[in-house]
């Protein structure tokens, strides 16, 4: 019987991570294949009803958030994170206001829907903006430690 | 990467297995390091140096090719 134990060897840990990556790639291909099949046979609605769609979107969002850490590390500008935060917040408020406003137009005056949609867009945009701010702030602090 | 681990290990009378147990890795990893086929982390390099009573540069230092040519 194979004895299962915690891996302590750094080389095997790395190998293990590489194996997980391979499995993840295959799994994603499988999920995409199933979703593509659903799309062809049942149309877009049938595809999005599949719980695998939720899994796919969730992992895509998580991987996008995790890769933000890498994008921030790539930035080499000295600009302050506060300025970036203010600019992105201003743009976000403008965009969510526009979307909310556009939604109130239409056949009937639909103020509630406009507020809800604008609010959802605002919150969805706010989370990544705050996360990027936090990452930039962190890398800025680490940078200033060096000097 | 080339290194002097094998010589240092034999000098202190350790087998690959014994060294592996001392530093907490598998024998295969030690073997791959000796052959220069695995690039260990600095942490593992230090552990190995402590185990064979050598300094980092005695085991892992290699001169730059251009410096070698300049010396000759």
Regions found by a protein language model. Give the residues of each.
Chain B
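Residue-level signal for the short linker/turn that defines the boundary of a DNA-recognition helix
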Residues: 3, 13-14, 40-43, 54
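Short basic helix-loop element that most often maps to the first helix and adjoining turn
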Residues: 3-22
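Short linear/disordered segments characteristic of secreted peptide precursors
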Residues: 8, 40, 66-69
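DNA major-groove recognition helix of helix-turn-helix/homeodomain DNA-binding modules
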Residues: 24, 43-58
């Amino acid at each position: 019987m194979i004895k299962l134990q915690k891996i302590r060897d750094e080389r095997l840990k790395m190998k293990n991570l590489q194996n997980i990556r391979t499995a993840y790639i295959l799994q994603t291909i499988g999920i995409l294949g199933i979703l593509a099949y659903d799309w062809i046979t049942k149309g877009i609605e049938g595809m999005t009803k599949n719980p695998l769609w939720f899994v796919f979107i969730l992992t895509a969002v998580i991987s996008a958030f995790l890769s933000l850490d890498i994008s921030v590390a790539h930035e080499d500008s000295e600009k302050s994170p506060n300025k970036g935060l203010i600019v992105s917040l201003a743009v976000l408020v403008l965009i969510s206001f526009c979307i909310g406003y556009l939604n109130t137009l239409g056949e009937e005056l639909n103020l509630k829907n406009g507020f809800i949609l604008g609010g959802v867009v605002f919150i969805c945009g706010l989370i990544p903006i705050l996360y990027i701010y936090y990452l930039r702030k962190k890398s800025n602090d680490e940078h200033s430690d060096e000097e | 990467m080339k290194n002097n681990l094998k010589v240092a290990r034999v000098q202190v009378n350790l087998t690959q297995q014994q060294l592996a147990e001392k530093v907490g890795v598998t024998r295969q990893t030690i073997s791959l390091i000796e052959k220069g086929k695995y690039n260990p982390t600095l942490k593992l390099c230090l552990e190995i140096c402590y185990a064979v009573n050598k300094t980092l540069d005695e085991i892992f230092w290699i001169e730059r090719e251009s410096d070698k040519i300049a010396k000759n």
